[in-house]
Structures are given as structure tokens and as C-alpha cells.
From Swiss-Prot:
GO terms under biological process: sperm individualization
Knockout or disruption consequences: RNAi-mediated knockdown severely impairs male fertility. Morphology of the sperm individualization complex is highly abnormal. Seminal vesicles contain very few mature spermatozoa, which are often bundled together. Female fertility is not affected.
Superkingdom of the organism of origin: Eukaryota
Miscellaneous information on this protein: Gudu is Chinese for 'alone without progeny' and refers to the male infertility phenotype.
Biased composition (Acidic residues): 37-51
The gene coding this protein: gudu
Keyword Repeat: yes
Name this polypeptide is given: Armadillo repeat-containing protein gudu
Region named Disordered: 1-53
Function: Important for spermatogenesis where it may have a role in sperm individualization.
Amino acid sequence: MIGTSSGTSHNRSRKKKEQCGSCPNRFSKDKRQVAAEDSDTTEVESSTDEEERWKEVARAAEIPADYYNIQKLVKYIKAGNQTATIVSLCCLKDYDLSTQINQFAISDIGGLDVLVNILECSDTKCCLGALKVLSDITLNIDIRKTIVDLDGIPLIVDILNSSMKDLKTMAAETLANVCKVRLARKYVRTCGGIPKLVDLIDIKLSILKTPRDQLSPDDLESLDMTRAGARALFTLADSKHNMEQMRKSGIVPLMAQLLKSCHIDVVIPIMGTVRKCSSEPKFQLAITTEGMIPDIVSHLSSENTELKMEGSTAIYKCAFDGTTRDLVREAGGLEPLVTIIKDKNVRENKPLLRGATGAIWMCAVTDANVKVLDQLRTVNHLVALLNDECDEVLTNVTGAISECVRFQSNREQLRQAGGLPAMVSLLNSSHAPLLENLAKGLKECAEDPDSMRILEDLDAVRLIWSLLKNPTTRVQAHAAYAICPCVRNANDSAELVRSLVGAMELVVGLLKSKDIMVLSAVCAAIATIAQDQTNLAILTDLKVIYKLADLVQTTDDLLRMNLAAAVAACACFGNNTEELGRLRTVTPIVTYMTSDNPLVHRSTAMALEKLSMDPQNCITMHQSGVVPFLLECIGSTNKELQLAAAGCLRNIRELALRAEEYLLKIDDD
């Protein structure tokens, strides 16, 4: 007999322990112990009380005759001979096994144990029949978990060694469903199943490019096997460990080949695998070097929305690299992306909209891409999406706008399209990535005087300032950077700052932050606010000098640049110059001149010029060896750097002359 009764289940278990070669150690550990060793295997094995209640309700409903007929067939499989088993399996397939009640019929009578047991037999027809049933019923999450508990994964993986294509196809189809359980994904990897599945998708390019109705029966079998393998790999790619194993098994060139297929049912799962893998840096590079970008772009114009979603999301994840962004433009990928976001029928498809807007955002980082997007009136289409209810979509939209408005023409376009009020209203959101992009975009808009007038009318400066209270450091940093042009370009900016209760206290308080980006942005904001003498007096009362002095030992060039600018702005009030010298800030600031960044040189020279107003500071600078650096800066093409360096040298020289005159006077006396 092919099937077993409950009395022989112990023998079957012992037989598996002795004969399973795919996973020799899988019986040496308790499942819970295995799960604890790998983060990919954490799975809630028990259903909630609510789930159990709904199962009971489903069973308690009027039970159809098919339920009992299916259970009779399972009994025949258990007790029948080989022929009866095959016939019963074929009859079982005639029922709709995708319905829950029919799935219950199999599991309630112990049919899952029987089906898994059949996978061990040597009769290929029985195995094929069992796999066909399993591939249908494993759409049910509880059945998937049961298959894993019955140690079915190693048996299915072993079948991938078969020489029969249809058997391997059904095994891969079953794995595609069962591996939605995390523990199953680990078992496939540890049993060596990933290289076998990768082998399934190694197919001739001629088959991929030939329409299905023109393929021979053997080629059709190969195509179906490839599709099943692609589906299984798509499910397995939810694990980082599996993705790395897939890469080592040589999946990258095979993915590139499958993307050229004319068969949508093959392209969709492999595009999904590309999308999942593109979150890994090693895959991002491989996707570019294998020339996948043009093929991904070609599918963006497909009629299939799932394919467009997978493709646009893959570009979104890969376009962090400048080379990839250029390839997208050269392949004509920007046009279909804009076509997607302006299609009103896409608005309800959030995954597709999220992928397309994200891809546009990443591509807009490159200036050449922005020029193409301008020709497509992309800013107008993005503004139309600012009323979307999905935070992820809004994050991508505002991110794309923030990159586009780096150019003055797009600031005007955004203003004319009515985008500013919509962006300002979103400042009340609690989604940190969205707030970060809003701050970046409004910072660029504040550079435009006309846009700044609108922002003032909308009370945007107060809302941006309030973002400094946000617990996310990146939001704090970009908000502080956005404050700079707002203060610089606002009407009566000095009074505007003072009208915001607690505004300067909030800024100075952030100098205690541990985040370099926040500190740098806050220093830039202080340098701007301190341009007004009244505001500078308030900052001085808030002990800003002491907090700045605590930061001078930094080695970060961005912080050095903005810190030096803040020191330059604050030094010229009261006795701040002398106090900064007393706090031993001069020598560390002189070391900033060793930086390779000319912007650091400029702000450092400006700070040193202000500090050199105090004679003691001049002496310290001279002893620190600042003169050669200043002489070199005088030859710079940057006028501000030239003037600041010359001013500092003048102050040092004047002190030296006064000292020389004093010594001569003493000698004369």
C-alpha cells in the first residue's frame, strides 16, 4: 500500500530519520531551538483565539456533500493499493481545493499526513498526484504550517533532484506556497534547496522569447518549470540569508535573462525577486552591471499593473546609485514613470503609486534627470498627489519635489501649481520621513522671494521651527537647515524670530545633541539668526558661546564649516571674542585649515578674522602656525575667503607692529 494508517506513522518518522539525505541534521534539534537560532525563522505557530473561533464557525456552517466525498477519497488513499491511490488522487483534484471547507475535509481526517507520506514513495505518479493536491491546499496558512511540522520540506526539496520536469514543477509550486512560512524558508536553505531551485530557472533564451502557442510540448514543460522555480525563489527572497544564498548560486545572470521573456507569468515573479533583492547593496551593483535596467524599464509600459509595480519599486531601490539613475534616463524610463503617476486610475493602487513616485524621487537626485522631468511637467503631476492619504506615497512625492525645486524654474512651477499650501498643511503630520522631505523641500522654496512671501502668510516658519521638537534627529537637522533661508529671506526676519516664543532657546538647546548632522544644522541656523544684533544679544544671554566652545574639537568637516560660521557670527558681540579665547577655542579652529574642503577654509578664515580682534587670540594663532595657511588662502579665487584671510593677517601684523613699537620705546627709555 502507498498510504499508511496511524499505526505506521512512527515507522515513517523513523524511516525519514534514516533515509533523508537532504537535511541530515534536521532531527537532531528541537524545532523551537532551530527557530531561536535564526531571526528568519520566528513564526507564531499557534492561531489566535479569534482565528480558532472563525474556524469553528466555518465548520459549523452547513457542510456540503463534497466534504464527505473528499474524506472518502482520503480513506481510499490510506487503505488502497497503488492503483487506488493514483485514482483517488486524480479524483481529489476534480474538487475545488481552493475553498476552505474542502481543505478542512482533507486536514480533519488526517489527509495531510498521508499526502506527506506519499512524497517518500518511489512511484512518480503518486508523488505527482500528491504534489498537485498539496500545491492547491497550501494556499491555506494553517496547512502550510502543518506541512512544515510534518517535516514535509526536506521531502519536497528531495523531489527537486528528479529527472522529471513535471514533478520538479509541482514541487516548486508547492514550495512557493509553503515558504510563506518563515521556518519553511530556513528549512529550504538548510536542506540545500536554493541551488536546486536556481537550476530550474536556467532555460534557453529562445524559449523565453517564443510565444507559448508556438512552443513544443517539451519546451512548454521547461517554461512551466521555470515559472514554478521563479515563484518559489520569489517567496524565498523574503529572507536576507536566502537572498545571499541565491546570489552565490548564480541567480543574477539568470534573472537578467528571464527579464527578457515575453511570458508575463514568468517575468512577474522574477521581477518581484529583483525588487526584493535590490534592497541589498551587492544585488544593486549586480543588477546594474548585468544590464537589467533597460529590461526593467521596458516592462514599465506593460498593461500588467503588478509587473509595473515590481519594476518601478526595483528602480526605486536601485537608483541610490548615480550610474543606475543615468541608465534609467538613457533607457527612457522617466517617461513611463511619469505616465504612471498622472494616471488617475492608479490612485487606488498604492503599491504601484508608491513604487513610481519613489523611483521618480531617486532619479531626480541627478540634475540631468530633473531636466527631463521638467519637460514632462512632473512637478504639476506631483502636486496633484499631495492630497493622497498614504504616508509612504506622500513621503516619496515630497522627496521628489524637494529634489526638483533645487532649480528656480521648478520653485516657480510649484508656486503656480498651488503646491506650497498643500506642503505646509502636511507639516502637521507625525510621519518622520515625510516631515524630513517637507523640510528639505521648503528649505529650497524659501530661497525664492515670492515663495517666501507665501510661506510667511501660511505661518510656515513657525511650523518648521516646531519640527525642532521632533524626536527624530534627521527631522531636527533638516528643519534647522530650513530655518536658515526662512530667516535670511523673510520680511523683518529679526522680529519674526523674536515673535516665536522659546524659538532661540530651542535652537541653543539642540547644541547638546549627540548627532553630528543636528549639531551642524543648528550651527548653521545660529550663524543666520546671529546676523541681527538683538538676536545675537539674546543668544549670548543663553550661553551660546560656551556651547559652541564645547564642539570645537570635532573632526567632521560639515560641522567644522558651520561651527566656524556660528563662531564668526557670535564673536563680534560684547566680550565674546575674549571669552572664546579664554575657552581655548582658537587653536582647535586653526586646525580646521588642514581640511581639504575649501568651504571649511572660508568659514574658518571668517571666524579667525573675528577672533583676531583680540590681541591674545592673535598671539595664540601665530603660535599655532596659522600664517602659512592664511597666505595660501589669499591666493584663493573665493573673494570672501581672500578678504577674511587678509583681515586676519592684518590684525596679526598690526599686533606685531605695535609690539615692535613698544619694544623700541622701551629700548629708547
